[in-house]
């Protein structure tokens, strides 16, 4: 991996832990340049990408697809439900096949944590792997679009007070963001149901009730309650969760004028956030979605740079 004059070159992108601060800032800067229309698009029509999604997705899947098309790549159609996966084909063999066909970039979402390790360790698979989310592990492209959204607002990360709130244990978004935000100098707070908190967060910030900190926050990053990863013993009613942990109208009024609200979506309205606040003046949820395309363009460009440089 390398970066020279904001030109980032990556072999794979699977975890925020693998990126230097310089690479992170380079990708954010490049995403901003794409957003501003300052980048001349090269002829990438000889390059092939495949989006292999084994979990449901709207924003990540479609924004990668838009990004790939904006950059002029050829995007292979893949539907797990109609592929050989239904005949028992493993993830490894699916990616091995795509690689053998000449696919250079595989964007993958999979329910297994660290699914990518066997792929990037393979001496046979030559495709570059971009992690579109692994189980409860990492979500690097979401993290990078979150960083771009924050940077557009404040112009820096150092000293910002940021709360990450909600279903922490199951959130790959929380884990990716906490790692890099701490490295960039932000002051982190976590809150949500205690049974959805684990000691792995202790090294990155403080667990604190939202009502004790909300009026000091610069960024409130809400997380989706991942019902599909819970058993019944951990459940709350929608009303109880919203009252105890969600962004209510009363809590919204306590935020600083300069504070922003974020959410990776999909949003459970009137659970994590009151329905009418999703598009409120302080909300940047739609901006996050839009920024996803430009950051993912920067990621794909960095992968193509890395393949050209053979990093």
Swiss-Prot record:
Q: In which pathway does it act?
A: Pyrimidine metabolism; UMP biosynthesis via de novo pathway; (S)-dihydroorotate from bicarbonate: step 2/3
* UniProt GO MF annotations: amino acid binding; aspartate carbamoyltransferase activity
Record's keyword annotation contains RNA-binding: no
What does the entry list as the binding residues for carbamoyl phosphate? 59-60, 109, 139, 142, 265-266
| Catalysis performed (reactions) | carbamoyl phosphate + L-aspartate = N-carbamoyl-L-aspartate + phosphate + H(+)
Task: Name the UniProt key words of this record, in alphabetical order.
Answer: Pyrimidine biosynthesis, Transferase
| Keyword Hydrolase included in the entry's annotation | no
Annotated residues for binding of L-aspartate: 87, 172, 224
Which Pfam families does this entry report, sorted A to Z?
OTCace (PF00185), OTCace_N (PF02729)
Q: Which GO terms describe its cellular component?
A: cytosol
Instruction: Read off the PROSITE patterns from this record.
Output: CARBAMOYLTRANSFERASE
Q: Report the EC code(s) recorded for this entry.
A: 2.1.3.2
Which superkingdom?
Answer: Bacteria
One GO term (biological process): amino acid metabolic process
| EC class of the enzyme, as a word | transferase
- What PANTHER family has UniProt attached to this entry? ASPARTATE CARBAMOYLTRANSFERASE, ORNITHINE CARBAMOYLTRANSFERASE, MITOCHONDRIAL
The job of this chain, per UniProt, is described as: Catalyzes the condensation of carbamoyl phosphate and aspartate to form carbamoyl aspartate and inorganic phosphate, the committed step in the de novo pyrimidine nucleotide biosynthesis pathway.
Q: Read off the NCBIfam families from this record.
A: asp_carb_tr, PRK00856.1
**Family membership:** Belongs to the aspartate/ornithine carbamoyltransferase superfamily. ATCase family.
Quaternary organization: Heterododecamer (2C3:3R2) of six catalytic PyrB chains organized as two trimers (C3), and six regulatory PyrI chains organized as three dimers (R2).
Q: What is this protein called?
A: Aspartate carbamoyltransferase catalytic subunit
Native organism: Streptococcus equi subsp. equi (strain 4047)
* Gene expressing this chain: pyrB
